[in-house]
Amino acid sequence: MNEDNHESSSSGCDNQIEFLVSEAEQRRRRVNHLDTEVHGLGYDPFSYCGRRVHVLLLTKLISVLTIPFYVAIIIFISFFGNATSVMFSVIILGSVLISTCYGAFRGAKMCLIPFVIIQLVFLIYDLILITILLLAVVFPKMFLSALLRLPLEDIPFGTDQVLLGCSLLLALLLAPLVWTTHVVYIDFLFISQVDETLHMLKEANQKVSQDDVSPNRMMF
């Protein structure tokens, strides 16, 4: 009787092992098939420059290159703002910079969110400034236009040329703002996908471990 139970439990264990192996093989074939299709199409949503540069590397470069950009903003505010605005800019930009560098180099996706938010704020602020400068050029008799032209009266250049030049410089910042925000957001999606995959693998390993333990209990 015990031998029959031992044989039945052994056969059940063998069947479970064969089922797990066959299921893993089918998953491996599906992954290989999808990977072959992706390589055949030459498309990778997490790579740039012909799949030569990964989004992780780009995010690290962006986190480092934003340091002089944020420093320039703080210096600009120190010339035209008061001590309170400088203090708040140092606190906000410094915390965002530290969070972005940590998230880029440590793979912490939640630390990348402040960078995306402040980039969107910069983008909206840039668009508003461009609109104001263009309105000041198109409608020179507006009260806002008079306020903008008053500090420019002593400049040897024409006020319209100065306003158009400033709007052009602000327009040139739109592309870097949009691109860096896009790259960091894609990195956020990549880290989320990696975390989800690792969580699924952990659950699969726990399930396999439970399936391996249960036949041993039956045999005992």
Curated annotation (Swiss-Prot):
Its main location: membrane. It is found in: Membrane. The keyword Transmembrane helix applies. The keyword Membrane applies. Coiled coil: none annotated. One of its GO terms (cellular component) is membrane. Keywords: Membrane, Transmembrane, Transmembrane helix. The chain crosses the membrane at residues 61-81, 85-105, 115-135, 150-170. It is a multi-pass membrane protein. This is Uncharacterized protein B0416.3. It comes from Caenorhabditis elegans.
